[in-house]
Each structure stands twice: as structure tokens, then as C-alpha cells.
Amino acid sequence: MQQLIAEITKSQLKTDLPSFRPGDTLRVHVKVVEGTRERIQIFEGVVIKRRGGGISETFTVRKVSYGVGVERTFPIHTPRIAKIEVLRRGKVRRAKLYYLRNLRGKAARIKEIR
């Protein structure tokens, strides 16, 4: 039984994913269905956490839109994600960047890896 589950999940895993970590700035292209139409919506922000493993792995991206912080959690291997672009590599010393929720403006900047 365990082997069957492992086989099924292996077939569902995406292989074209870029490597990214918390602190990186991503542009996530999400497929959105509105009625009968399907379009691509772009969500750009900083990865504040990655959790899980295998098919159930998720990541959370945070951005500030019109002065309001917006966080969105995506399953990594979902077919709803068309593609993920890594825009910047950030240098951080934590795996979970929850402290960014309390910072505003320039204080919330993350150093870039050259």
C-alpha cells in the first residue's frame, strides 16, 4: 500500500521547479478560472516560509499592496501554478520570516545575494 501511494505521488510531482528559499523574491504565475475563462494572474513577493515535503509541500509569499500586507500560500506541486520565476536571491538567517509582518517600508528590506 505504501509503495502504491509513493508511486502515485511521484507521478504528481513537478520537475520544472526552480530552487528557491525563504528570503527570495518570486513571481508566481497562477491560473485563475473566472466563469468559463481561464487567465494567468501574477503574484510577486518575498517567500516567508516553506513547509512540508513531497506532494504536500507549500510555500508562502508576502507582498505589500496599497499599504496592506497580503500573504498567499501555494502548494508547490499544484497544476494551478503555471510557472515560478526567481527575481532576487535574499540573504536571511531564518527559515521562517514571520518578523517581516511587523516591519514597514525600508526596515522590511532583505539583503540580496550577489
From Swiss-Prot:
It holds the Pfam family Ribosomal_L19. GO terms for biological process: translation. It comes from the Bacteria. Gene3D superfamilies: 2.30.30.790. GO terms for molecular function: structural constituent of ribosome. SUPFAM superfamilies: Translation proteins SH3-like domain. PROSITE patterns: RIBOSOMAL_L19. GO terms for cellular component: cytosolic large ribosomal subunit. This protein is located at the 30S-50S ribosomal subunit interface and may play a role in the structure and function of the aminoacyl-tRNA binding site. Belongs to the bacterial ribosomal protein bL19 family. This is Large ribosomal subunit protein bL19. It comes from Bacillus cytotoxicus (strain DSM 22905 / CIP 110041 / 391-98 / NVH 391-98).
